[in-house]
Design a protein with these regions (language model features):
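Short, glycine/proline-biased beta-turn/loop segments that scaffold the active-site neighborhood
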Residues: 256, 481-536, 610-624
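Peptidoglycan glycan-strand catalytic modules in the bacterial/periplasmic cell-wall system
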Residues: 46-49, 53-307, 313-316, 322-325, ...
Length: 774
């Protein structure tokens, strides 16, 4: 009987062993549950953020979506404290086992499974935890979790075969979700401590490793005391593992929990506006006519041209991975190398802040504070202002959300007038306040806006890009997406057409007011000053002084349709450009990027260079999968380009941009043009040297928000100083290799007229000019 009982036990044991072996064999081969294949094991982290780099190797930021904000780093870039804390806390015999710690597993089965000691600790190794994170779905029940365990054991053994211990630790820390969109140790170190992982202190490393047990429970932002206690548990485990002495533990455990918390998202980093513009640009889909409303046909045409001519536009949907799927900037871990220079980007952002925030904005606030219509012009009636504000309400995200939720118009408008807690932008940092959504709309309209871009005229490489004040609060990108009336900055293109049609800079024109018949109606352009009125003046003088009468005279001698065509050749694709006499005064709306690119032709022998934002793209393994080259087209002949260059240099040396010399003391050869529009609504300045073409626009969110006086509202006051401040910073940095001693490629003694020009024609200082379109 006893012998039979023993045989029975052995039979049961043998059956269990054989069944277990068969089960593990089936799991190993993927017959039971999911078993990753070799390719999957070789690249277990397949979804992580795309990194955007500057031309000088700095990380500008990342593109991510939800839990894909992950930047993978190698083991050698992690603090030794991280490694020791992780091993001591999660798997003390990590370096001794091959994926499964049988001693810890047996202890866990006896204490937790048999004796019911829930606080006895688990038996999972770091490798098993990694297998769970990578391949196990969240279990819906205890039974399902028990079934997942043996699958994770097998995966852990396979991971140990493919990877070294260091690589397993790197995988674990790169994959773990540390909360607050901090996925992976690099993002976590930056989010919680504003540091690189290799620079973490012992206490900081222990705090992050403490999250590995239960991130929500030991969240240091929400539960600092609990997180500190957990950190000290990690430190005590390091003592047990021999990584710390008792004395060191006592000293570190007494330290307070100190965070430098900053949630990381796509709005952070440098060159934010450019990164967001590129993200949408690269992810664009092939334009389909049915996706555009009838009134936006021009945009469909523009996008179609971009799709066919610019390799970067829609790049993700034009290029495909090995599996045939399109690239995704949110999850494919690409490296996008932009042409931005991080130093020049910083100088540009500083220049915009220095002039707009510290100089213009206080003056504008003082001027508008006296108006009941603030920030709008006092020419508007209360009824007109109400219409504008109501339009802003209906365009807001809050309105759209409430409308979709079924609220009535009255309920929505009542909600917009009710004060609530909110955080608003100031130049001194975000401020918590009590304000109604309607008041916040009006508040944000008080801020002057600005856009700035700088590029290399030879290669098209965009070196600096400032799309606005602060992307978190002002997401509209003025440089590429915004279009504003260009005023006098359009005149060099008119003069270029004149040169192409045989005119010379020294040809004479009557400087007087004249009425032209346009489509049977009289048109009489006005000029802001009457200097040399009634005299015959050279075209060069007319451009230097931004004289409206000379521009109108030229327009009367040229074909307006040809003018439209040459604007297109210069890369200006604004849909509201129409052939008319008044087009010579710049009433059309154009983006900063288009204007800056157009002016490259004057510094580049008549060859216009398109902006190039990206030089190359790498995949997540470091392979170059795309490179980009300059895109150029000749718009005017080289001889005429030299004529235009000498005239635009005259704008600086004796015209409306003269303050670059006498106020900002900028040296070297510079060509430029100022621009101001009706009622001082838009201030423009485009300037160029042999090495850089840069342009900026300053104005209100809407045209009725502007300075009252021309002295403050002209382009020479609003926009020119940004260019000047930027260039002074650039010239002061020898590492950039940009110098005022570099000269334009002009023949020695070049004379565009082949005849002497009077000194009066060359030098007559004018600070700025008003542009009128009537």
């Amino acid at each position: 009987m006893r012998k039979h009982f023993i045989y029975t036990l052995w039979g049961i044991f043998a059956t269990f062993v054989v069944s277990a072996m068969l089960a593990f064999f089936a799991i190993w081969n993927g017959w039971i549950g999911y078993m990753p294949d070799i390719e999957d094991l070789q690249n277990p982290i397949s979804r992580f953020a795309t990194q955007v780099y500057s031309a000088d190797g700095k990380v500008l930021g990342t593109w991510n979506l939800n839990k894909e904000n992950r930047i993978v780093i190698p083991y050698k870039k992690m603090s030794p404290y991280l490694i020791k804390a992780l091993v001591a806390t999660e798997d003390a015999r990590f370096y001794e086992h091959s994926g499964i710690d049988y001693r810890a597993l047996g202890r866990a089965i006896i204490k937790r499974g048999i004796l019911g000691q829930t606080n006895a600790g688990g038996g999972s190794t770091i490798t098993q935890q990694l297998a769970k994170q990578l391949y196990s779905e969240k279990a819906g029940s205890t039974l399902e979790r028990l079934l997942q365990k043996p699958i994770e054991w097998v995966i852990a053994i396979r991971l140990e075969r493919y990877y070294t211990k260091q690589e397993i630790i790197a995988l674990y820390l790169n994959y773990f979700d540390f909360l607050h969109n901090a996925v992976g140790i690099k993002t976590a170190a930056n989010t919680y401590f504003n540091k690189e992982p290799k620079d973490l202190t012992l206490c900081e490393a222990a705090t992050l490793i403490g999250l590995c047990k239960n991130p929500s429970l030991f969240n240091p932002v929400r539960y600092p005391d609990r997180a500190r206690d957990r950190r000290n548990v990690v430190l005590s485990q390091m003592v047990k593992a021999g990584y710390l002495s008792r004395g060191e533990y006592s000293r570190y455990a007494a330290e307070p929990l100190t965070l430098n918390f900053h949630r990381t998202d796509h709005k952070d980093g440098t060159a934010t506006y450019l990164r967001e513009y590129l993200r949408h640009y690269m992810m664009a889909k092939r334009p389909e006519r049915g996706n555009y409303p009838s009134w936006n046909y021009a945009q469909f045409v523009t996008d179609s041209i971009l799709w066919n001519t610019d390799p970067l536009y829609g790049w993700c949907n034009k290029n495909f991975k090995k599996d045939g799927s399109p690239y995704n900037v949110y999850s494919d871990g690409l490296k996008v190398f932009t042409t931005i220079d991080s130093r020049m980007q910083r100088y540009a952002e500083e220049a915009v802040y220095q002039h707009v925030a510290r100089y213009l904005q206080p003056i504008f606030n003082k001027e508008t504070s006296r108006k009941p219509s603030s920030p709008y012009s006092d020419k508007l009636t209360p009824k007109q202002i109400k219409v504008i504000l109501n339009r802003s309400i209906t365009q807001s995200e809050r309105y759209q959300t409430m409308k979709a939720a079924g609220y009535s118009e009255q309920e929505i408008h009542d909600a917009f007038r009710k004060k609530i807690d909110m955080t608003v932008f100031t130049y001194h940092g975000d401020v918590d306040t009590l304000m109604s959504p309607l008041d916040s709309i009006r508040y944000y309209k008080t801020f002057l806006r600005s856009g700035f871009m700088s590029m290399d005229p030879k290669t098209g490489a965009v070196k600096a890009y400032v799309g606005g004040l602060d992307y978190s609060h002002f997401m509209y990108d003025i440089v590429s997406l915004g279009r504003r009336q260009v005023g006098s900055t359009i005149k060099p293109f008119l003069y270029s057409l004149a040169m192409e049609n045989g005119f010379s800079p020294c040809d004479l024109a009557p400087n007087r007011q004249h009425t032209y018949m346009v489509a049977g109606r009289p048109w009489t352009p006005r000029n802001a000053n009457h200097s040399r009125y009634g005299q015959m003046v050279t075209l060069k003088w007319g451009l230097q002084q931004s004289n409206t009468w000379i521009s109108a005279y030229l327009m009367s001698k040229l074909n307006p349709q040809q003018f439209v065509q040459i604007l297109r050749d210069f890369g200006i694709n604004s849909p509201d450009i129409h052939a008319s006499m008044s087009l010579c005064l710049g009433p059309c709306e154009v983006s900063v990027s288009e204007m800056v690119s157009a002016y490259t032709a004057f510094a580049n022998h008549g060859i216009r260079t398109a902006p190039m934002f990206v030089s190359r793209i790498e995949d997540n393994e470091g392979n170059t999968i795309a490179t980009f080259q300059p895109r150029m087209n000749e718009v005017i002949g080289a001889e005429n380009a030299m004529k235009m260059l000498t005239m635009l240099m005259g704008v600086v040396d004796g015209g409306t941009a003269g303050r670059l010399r006498y106020r900002y003391n900028l040296e070297g050869q510079i060509g430029a043009k100022t621009g101001t529009t009706n009622n001082n609504s838009d201030g423009w300045f485009i300037g160029f040297t042999p090495q850089l073409v840069s342009g900026c626009w300053v104005g209100g969110e809407e045209r009725d928000i502007h300075f009252d006086t021309m002295s403050m509202g002209q382009g020479a006051t609003m926009a020119l100083p940004i260019w000047a401040i930027f260039m002074k910073k650039v010239y002061a940095d020898p590492s950039l290799g940009i110098s005022p001693t570099v000269k334009f490629d002009l023949p020695d003694g070049y004379d565009p007229c082949h005849k002497p020009v009077s000194e009066q024609d060359d030098f007559e200082q004018v600070d700025g000019i008003d542009e009128v379109f009537e």
